[in-house]
Amino acid sequence: MSHADRYAALVDALERSVFDGPGHVPATTRQAARDHAARAVSGSTEPPQTSGVPDPWARHVDKVVRHAYTITDADIEALKAAGRSDDEIFETTVAAAVGAGVARLERALSLLKEGR
């Protein structure tokens, strides 16, 4: 059994829960965060605003995906000032992080499969 096969059901369950399950943020926003993360991991420099991530999430999603370690309290306060709740901020952050993580996992597994 390959690494990909071993964890496929778990990854699928995680993705369904994060991107399709109920939440404070519309599923379409969480899915757009996932899609932006996948493109960013593949090397795309497309701005998040053009990838379907609505404002005010676009900058935050891109930062989570590319430079999560640079997120500060001021970034979170800016989202709150834009009218976003703690629950919405958490869900969108998780969607971007899981999207990036799954995209990186899939890339790594494809490289292993290719024998690199």
Model region roles, listed by residue range:
Residues 1-116:
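Hydrophobic alpha-helical segments
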